[in-house]
């Protein structure tokens, strides 16, 4: 079972990661990692960095039925 400290240490080693990458690396369930990242954000230890929509070459993200599901969300330590 992953701990909050392991999530923090992994971010410190890798620089920035997506929640899914953290989940796979630590072999922990995605909802648990999401909760830990939110807790680190509340504590002021981690920052969520959403990817900008200007990377969409076709400009169809606004009309995408998945509602910008293709945009990545990165996490970094503060």
Swiss-Prot record:
* Keyword Protein biosynthesis found: no
Q: Which InterPro entries match?
A: FeoC, Tscrpt_reg_HTH_FeoC, WH-like_DNA-bd_sf, WH_DNA-bd_sf
Its keywords, alphabetically, are:
DNA-binding, Iron, Iron-sulfur, Metal-binding, Repressor, Transcription, Transcription regulation
Which GO molecular function annotations are given, in alphabetical order?
Answer: DNA binding; iron ion binding; iron-sulfur cluster binding
Question: Which Pfam family, an example, fits this chain?
Answer: FeoC
The residues that hold iron-sulfur cluster are 56, 61, 64, 70
Record keyword Endoplasmic reticulum present: no
Which superkingdom?
A: Bacteria
Q: What does this protein do?
A: May function as a transcriptional regulator that controls feoABC expression.
Entry's family note? Belongs to the FeoC family.
This protein is called what?
Probable [Fe-S]-dependent transcriptional repressor
Which organism does this sequence originate in? Answer: Salmonella arizonae (strain ATCC BAA-731 / CDC346-86 / RSK2980)
Q: Which gene encodes it?
A: feoC
């Amino acid at each position: 079972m992953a701990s909050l400290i392991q999530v923090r240490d992994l971010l410190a080693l890798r620089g920035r990661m997506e929640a899914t990458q953290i989940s796979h690396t630590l072999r922990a369930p995605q909802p648990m990692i999401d909760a830990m990242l939110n807790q680190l954000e509340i504590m002021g230890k981690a920052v969520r960095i959403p990817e900008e929509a200007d990377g969409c070459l076709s400009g169809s993200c606004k009309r995408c039925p998945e509602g910008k599901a293709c945009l990545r969300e990165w996490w970094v330590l503060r």
